[in-house]
UniProtKB/Swiss-Prot annotation:
The gene is RPE1. Its cofactor is Co(2+); Fe(2+); Mn(2+); Zn(2+). The keyword Glycoprotein does not apply. Keywords: Carbohydrate metabolism, Cobalt, Iron, Isomerase, Manganese, Metal-binding, Zinc. It comes from Encephalitozoon cuniculi (strain GB-M1). Disulfide bonds: none annotated. This is Ribulose-phosphate 3-epimerase. The lineage of its organism: Eukaryota, Fungi, Fungi incertae sedis, Microsporidia, Unikaryonidae. Pathway: Carbohydrate degradation; pentose phosphate pathway; D-xylulose 5-phosphate from D-ribulose 5-phosphate (non-oxidative stage): step 1/1. InterPro entries: Aldolase_TIM, Ribul_P_3_epim, Ribul_P_3_epim-like, RibuloseP-bd_barrel. CDD domains: RPE.
Length: 213
């Protein structure tokens, strides 16, 4: 994840036809998939557990896993990390050091996610490989992008960390986040009438916008 990338969150895909959705993502040129893991303990929603995660990981993508759970290590230990480049947990979660140690022993990057109301913390920034700035309240797709969260990008940059932004990203605001390394796009992609064109356009804007800026 050293190069700038768009990652597609499958939170808003058709889970009743997941295999076809993943196949279409591949045909449309998607390289990175963002897996949102929820179990109702940290956010009031539920997605999928280790069994389904491992089936998804059999597909040929670069995966990052966003753990919106209170006890991430319980799930992480059941995941096939050979196919995972990055795991992100939330700032509010306990035992971040234990999670970081477990991941790094397996050559997986350790990320910290910051909710819209969560401030940048010096100790956390120094411990993380990657910081995911949430531009919506975590737990549900389709929310409006909170532009005030962009101020955190420069704060995190001072620590020399890779920065991602997650939530409400569409063509109308992608140009505002070109200072990030990773943009997580979900509902904007899946609700598009022409998904392949949407992906091409939003990727071009994200990459070319950073070149001109």
């Amino acid at each position: 994840m050293l190069k700038k990338r768009i990652g597609i969150s499958i939170l808003d895909c058709n889970f009743g036809n997941l295999e076809e959705e993943l196949g279409e993502l591949k045909r449309n040129g998607v390289t990175n998939i963002h897996l949102d893991v929820m179990d109702t303990t940290f956010v009031k929603n539920i997605t999928f557990g280790p069994c389904i995660i491992n089936r998804i990981l059999e597909h040929d993508f670069v995966f990052d896993v966003h753990m919106m759970v209170e006890s991430p290590l319980d799930i992480i230990m059941q995941i096939d990390l050979e196919r995972v480049s990055l795991v992100t947990i939330h700032s509010e979660v306990c035992d971040k050091a234990g999670v970081a140690e477990y991941l790094r022993k397996r050559n997986v990057l350790f990320g910290i996610a910051l909710n819209p109301e969560t401030q940048v913390d010096d100790a956390e920034m120094r411990s993380a490989d990657f910081v995911l700035i949430m531009s919506v309240k975590p737990g549900f797709g389709g929310q409006k992008f909170q532009e005030e969260c962009l101020a955190k990008v420069e704060e995190v940059r001072r620590y020399g960390k890779m920065v991602g932004i997650d939530g409400g990203i569409e063509m109308s605001n992608i140009g505002r986040i070109t200072g990030a390394d990773y943009a997580v796009v979900g509902s904007g992609y899946f609700r598009s009438g022409d998904r392949k064109k949407f992906l091409r356009d939003i990727t071009d804007e994200f990459l070319c916008g950073s070149c001109s800026g």
